[in-house]
Amino acid sequence: MLGEQRITYNSTLENVEVLEAYTLLADGTRVNVEPDKIRTQDDVDADGSNIYSDSKVKLIIFPKVEVGATVYFKSRAQQHTPDFPGHFYTENYFSPHSKYKGVTFNLTHDPAIAIGIDAQGMKGGKVEPLPSDPKGSVRYSFSFEQDTTYPTEDWRLDLVHFAPRFAASSFKTYAEVGRSYQERAYPKTQITPDIQAP
């Protein structure tokens, strides 16, 4: 829906906070989103049924969305627990069905960690660290804007195949991703006394 924005995240691994959200009307009037219109909900799959997982959604319900209005939000996500210990990755894709303005990704990391960056369709790159960054940090800054939109299409490819994106990872190969996944997942496949048949 045009009057809603969803931010999906894993509640076990990260925190998401909406810092600011409003509708800007065609005449320049700003209408703030009320705090009770920013809701945390369980994620649902494509047919609307609940998903048994830690996936949550911050749902922002914008007021007075009408012809000529623009919706804006600013959020902060902080991942406090890695998906794979000893590794980092993040990815964000930009739908061709939405307009984007003023999107910025800043990434700062220790130089001892090798991070690969894929910023297809974005502007930016490596920049000088800020004085507030830890000494010796490596910093990247990328921006993205998209003024045009396209109607949705049935059976279109998934965004990962064509959309502009920002992705960063400490993994060097897909085989390394697979090994890390196996290390985390395999122990959970073992039969425990709690579920073993008598």
Model-identified regions with their sequence ranges:
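Short solvent-exposed loop/turn micro-motifs enriched in small/polar/acidic residues
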Residues: 14-16, 53-55, 98-100, 135
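Short, acidic/charged, Gly/Pro-enriched secondary-structure junctions
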Residues: 22, 74-76
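Globin-like tetrapyrrole-binding proteins
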Residues: 71
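Secretory-pathway-linked proteins and extracytosolic
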Residues: 62, 66, 78-89, 93-198
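Ligand-binding face of N-terminal immunoglobulin V-set domains in extracellular IgSF glycoproteins
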Residues: 1-15, 56-61, 75
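Edge strands and adjacent loops of beta-rich recognition modules
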Residues: 41-55, 83-85
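Solvent-exposed beta-hairpin/edge-strand motifs
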Residues: 7-39, 100-115
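Short, solvent-exposed secondary-structure capping/transition elements
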Residues: 2, 32-33, 80-84
